[in-house]
Amino acid sequence: SSDVCSSDLYTVYFYAETDTPAESFGTWKGNTLMPNTNEQFDSGEKTGAYLSYSTSENQKINVRVGISYISCGKAKENLKQITTWDFNKVHTQAVSEWNNILDKIEVAGNEEDKIKLYTALYHCYLQPVDKTGENPKWISTEPNFDDFYAIWDTFRATHPLFTLLTPSVQSNMIRSLIDIYRNEGY
């Protein structure tokens, strides 16, 4: 993969578990299926994995996925953050975490205006992503945020908003920018 602001390629590793054994599995690269293989390496071609099931009507299969920019082993370790197979519990926890941020602002007005505001707040927090512990470029104990999209514009309103709503997150972003400067010179 590559990111929006850079042509530098990077690898995303993943580790997945299901609550139901697959009847068959494999990987694919380009147009070639590779049955019974459980890992694949980046070669610039489109690459993926598949699982096949025979399911009964309305049967649900739960999947947990961990990702990492470091290794498959780190992806497996990151998967441990999801402690349950209960989708509703995971969903409720995610909603609660978002509400901890979104509830910091109270809005008077009609529903349409509230939807616009809360959608914009949600979008503000989609990037940059906290990838602390996932820096493949250098070893650091500092926070790691490396996907500052259009920072030349977001410093005007988004980052002051972060300072008001989530000052510790904003502080970590600044520490990350300083760490990038120390290691890459910009």
Feature-to-residue mapping (PLM):
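Alpha-helical support elements that line or immediately flank enzyme active sites
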Residues: 119-132, 147-171
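Helix-terminus loop motifs that line ligand-binding clefts
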Residues: 138, 169-186
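Short, small-residue-biased leader/transition segments that mark boundaries at the very start
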Residues: 3-6
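Accessory "access/gating" subregions that flank catalytic or transport cores
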Residues: 86-143
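Terminal amphipathic helices with adjacent charged low-complexity linkers/tails
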Residues: 67-79
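Edge strands and adjacent loops of beta-rich recognition modules
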Residues: 25-45, 92-99
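Short strand-edge motifs at loop-to-beta-strand transitions and within beta-strands
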Residues: 47-51
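Short Pro-Gly-centered flexible turn/kink motifs
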Residues: 55-67
